[in-house]
Structures are given as structure tokens and as C-alpha cells.
């Protein structure tokens, strides 16, 4: 008899730690931001349930059995969970909808039943992630040596998230950075980056032919840009040199022909003198020698000139010979004396 009780005690000692371990085990539950998540309770005998109390940082809700044909009744005890919690029958699984980042954390469910062990505790850890968008592949380093494209590819998501892993196919490389040594024989390959977190995954691809084309185009663009800059520089130097030589020429011309000189006066207004010249016609004496047939006298006007030029007036004055003078000799048979001009400027 004593031996029988000893075997029962040993059996209880073996099963108690196992039951305690089950109660203290933490289940990880992953949820997606803005969507719903389910906490699995999985009660084997729903009719034995009296009440389930849910707590987190604060009290969350408690669940009581409904009628035989209705779902369990949920009473929310914290305002942050209003209209976002319901329970599924018949296993009393708890559902939280419209997940927020602040919902993440530890949760505990105390399950009270009518039979032994009367109270069972289950623990959960809720992790919330964003659904990943399409990753982006960028070329962070490019080089081309001996017809080989050496490219460093970087794969990234729009918002850096926790627990995001990257994988490259067909190479099977892990990590968001991939170093490629592309040869002409491998131009038909396509590299695919897959970003993944515990709740979602997405991918993007790029062809090897596109990589090498982008490298060649990049070098051509760089070379063309450099030539354009050099051409603009030489054009600017040519323009500045032309302006400098022109100004130097004008300065030297001003030194050779200073302002006020006859050349400058004539160059600026070659018709100014003719507009201000007055001619006087005077008959010369018959005894005037042929060598002295014309006499020019130039008289300069005052330096102060009127602002507006007056019209040119020509005055002719004729002098008649006296009646007592005889006829001229044969040598003087030419027209009576040549006219003499008096020029007034």
C-alpha cells in the first residue's frame, strides 16, 4: 500500500513541472499594422470555462461564455481596445483588430474553469510589423575593366524595419549588398532581391544586360559632360581675350590721335566745316598776276558756338572796274582777274 502511494507521488512530481512549464511558456504572435491578429487559446472543454481575464500593461478585457448558440461575451476594460476586441467560439480565441504599434507587448490570459486545475495561465508576446513594400535596387559602385562589369548592388525597403532579411537569387547570397563581377557570357542573368519580415515579403529584379548598359551610359555621359565644360571654358577665354584686345586697341588709338586734333575733328564730323564756311566773291584788279590768281584766307570763328547750327548763307560781293581803265594787253585778254575766296570758319 505504501509503495502504491509512493508511485502516485512520483507521478505527480513528474507531471507538475511539465504542467507548470506549459503555463509559463510564452507564445509569440505576429501582427500586421492596421490589420487583425488572433491569440490562440484553444480550450479543449469550453463548457468548463467560467471566465477568462486578459491583461497586458493594464487590464484589457474579460470573456464569459455565451449561450449555447452564441459567441462568447467580451467586456472591454480599457478604452484603448474599445470596439477592437472580440472572441471566437467555441475555443475562446481572442481577436484584436486595427492593430497599432502601441498594442505590441506581453499579454496574459487567466483561464478559470469549473474543474481542476481551476485556473490556467497562458502568456503571449505580440510583435507588430509593417507590410513590406517593393524593395529598391541601387548601384552604389560601378567599374568596367577588361569587358567585365564590376557592380555593387544595394537592396533596401522604403522604411527601415526590424527583423528584415534580404536574399539574392540565383546566387543565393544573403544580405542587402551584393558584389557582382559580370562578364559578357552572363548578360542573360537576372538578379532578384527578396526582402522579408515575419509577416510579409516582396522582391525586385534587375537584368545583367541593364547593369552593363547603365555603366557604359554613365561613362559616356561623364565624358560628354567633361568635354562640354572644357568647351565652355575655352569659349569664355576667347571672349575675354577679344574684349581685352579691343579695349587695348581703342586706348592706343586715343593716344595717337588725342581729342581736339584736326584728324579727330575731321573724323567726327567731316561736313561741319563746310556748313560753317562763308564765301565772299571779290573781283581782283586787272593787273593781278596769273600766279596769284586765287587767294584763300581762313578765319576761325569763336570757340563758343551756338547750340544750333544756323543755315549756311553765301554772300557774293562784286567789284566793278573804273571806266578810265583801258583795255588790257594781249596777255591780259583773259577774263578779268580770277576770283578770290575768303573763308570764314
UniProtKB/Swiss-Prot annotation:
Q: Please list which residues make up the signal peptide.
A: 1-21
UniProt keyword annotations, A-Z: Adaptive immunity, Autophagy, Cell adhesion, Cell membrane, Disulfide bond, Glycoprotein, Immunity, Immunoglobulin domain, Innate immunity, Membrane, Phosphoprotein, Receptor, Repeat, Signal, Transmembrane, Transmembrane helix
Task: Indicate the impact reported for residue 55 to A.
Answer: Loss of dimerization
Q: What does the annotation give as the result of altering residue 112 to A? A: Loss of dimerization
Q: Name one Pfam family in it.
A: Ig_3
For the motif ITSM 1, what are the positions? Answer: 277-282
Q: Which residue intervals define the domain Ig-like C2-type in the entry?
A: 135-207
Membrane topology (Extracellular): 22-225
The transmembrane residues are 226-246
Q: What is the effect of changing residue 77 to A?
A: Loss of dimerization
Chain segments carrying region Disordered: 326-345
What's said on domains? Answer: The ITSMs (immunoreceptor tyrosine-based switch motifs) with the consensus sequence T-X-Y-X-X-[VI] present in SLAM family receptors have overlapping specificity for activating and inhibitory SH2 domain-containingbinding partners. Especially they mediate the interaction with the SH2 domain of SH2D1A and SH2D1B. A 'three-pronged' mechanism is proposed involving threonine (position -2), phosphorylated tyrosine (position 0) and valine/isoleucine (position +3).
Protein name (database record): SLAM family member 5
Which organism is this protein's natural source? Homo sapiens
Amino acid at each position: 500500500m505504501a509503495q502504491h502511494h509512493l508511485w502516485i507521488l512520483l507521478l505527480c512530481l513528474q507531471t507538475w513541472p511539465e504542467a507548470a512549464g506549459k503555463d509559463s511558456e510564452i507564445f509569440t504572435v505576429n501582427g500586421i499594422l492596421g490589420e487583425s491578429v488572433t491569440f490562440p487559446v484553444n480550450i479543449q472543454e469550453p463548457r468548463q470555462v467560467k471566465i477568462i481575464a486578459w491583461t497586458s500593461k493594464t487590464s484589457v478585457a474579460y470573456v464569459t461564455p455565451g449561450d449555447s448558440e452564441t459567441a462568447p461575451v467580451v467586456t472591454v476594460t480599457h478604452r484603448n481596445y474599445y470596439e477592437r476586441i472580440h472572441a471566437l467560439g467555441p475555443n475562446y480565441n481572442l481577436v484584436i483588430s486595427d492593430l497599432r504599434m502601441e498594442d505590441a507587448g506581453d499579454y496574459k490570459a487567466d483561464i478559470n474553469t469549473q474543474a481542476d486545475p481551476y485556473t490556467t495561465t497562458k502568456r503571449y508576446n505580440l510583435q507588430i510589423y509593417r507590410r513590406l513594400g517593393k524593395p529598391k535596387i541601387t548601384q552604389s559602385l560601378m567599374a568596367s575593366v577588361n569587358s567585365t562589369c564590376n557592380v555593387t548592388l544595394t537592396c533596401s525597403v522604403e522604411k527601415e524595419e526590424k527583423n528584415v532579411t534580404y536574399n539574392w537569387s540565383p546566387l543565393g547570397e544573403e544580405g542587402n549588398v551584393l558584389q557582382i563581377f559580370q562578364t559578357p557570357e552572363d548578360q542573360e542573368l537576372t538578379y532578384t532581391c527578396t526582402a522579408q519580415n515575419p509577416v510579409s515579403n516582396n522582391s525586385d529584379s534587375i537584368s545583367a544586360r541593364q547593369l552593363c548598359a547603365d555603366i557604359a551610359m554613365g561613362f559616356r555621359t561623364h565624358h560628354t559632360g567633361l568635354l562640354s565644360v572644357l568647351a565652355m571654358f575655352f569659349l569664355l577665354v576667347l571672349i575675354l581675350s577679344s574684349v581685352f584686345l579691343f579695349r587695348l586697341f581703342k586706348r592706343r588709338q586715343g593716344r595717337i590721335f588725342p581729342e581736339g586734333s584736326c584728324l579727330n575733328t575731321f573724323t567726327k564730323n567731316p561736313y561741319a566745316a563746310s556748313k560753317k564756311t562763308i564765301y565772299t566773291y571779290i573781283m581782283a584788279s586787272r593787273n593781278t598776276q596769273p600766279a596769284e590768281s586765287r587767294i584763300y584766307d581762313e578765319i576761325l570763328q569763336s570757340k563758343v558756338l551756338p547750340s544750333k547750327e544756323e543755315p549756311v548763307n553765301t554772300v557774293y560781293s562784286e567789284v566793278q572796274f573804273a571806266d578810265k581803265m583801258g583795255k588790257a594787253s594781249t596777255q591780259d585778254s583773259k577774263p578779268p582777274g580770277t576770283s578770290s575766296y575768303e573763308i570764314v570758319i
